[in-house]
């Protein structure tokens, strides 16, 4: 394990990525889809740990987490990193933090895990990592010329991603968290496997198959008064699209990489409560990832851009 940690430190020295932020009354959060737990690149799990160390977040929402991977990552990250994962044979979602997990507060749903965390500064947060259903991907339907009714697109949203958001919001314990949100903020982070209604607007419909769509997962969070951190800081969807899908998946392999893959913002950090965001970035390391099928030696181990944001408690 010591050799692995030294390996990570050496790799980290090669990048001058700036990660400064206030630690006294602030928090840095990250969402990171780790693409089959790093299986698609050489030394994938070591690279996952490396990039977490480079970003230096307080809490990380992970997706595509295989069994035993959080154990491996916490060992590589070292003390004081700890983890909680969804209670399932295939965890899929997990939360890493270098702060204190409050015992007996973790929650699991079909696509998410949540927990209460106490920061070493004394602040408390409620934090969710989610990974919504990947099937019936909305942008594929929206860009299909045979699709001419919104109901056809929404049919895929109403059986997977939409209900999964409702499941989280309607948990009895989540409702109790919501009652205390003026004192303890709630963060919902992860891979939504779908775009935002704030991005598919009249301004952008020409690049979205000529559709304006109120995607239900993000719309429901907005109606529950959660804020989309990226769109709050960057409200101009044309100049700041914030694409997170994909770092490497640019063309569909089934047609010899000649048909473009729709690129979209599908990884989010939502918040509600007594914090103010002041910085958010998409992240793929310092070396440009090579697209599929030339990706196996990439330094950055994911097909999604990670997203991290800094908040100040108020």
Swiss-Prot record:
Gene3D superfamilies: Endonuclease/exonuclease/phosphatase. The keyword Plastid does not apply. Keywords: Glycoprotein, Secreted, Signal. Its main location: secreted. The keyword Glycoprotein applies. PANTHER family: PROTEIN CBG08683, PTHR41349. This is Uncharacterized protein F14F9.5.
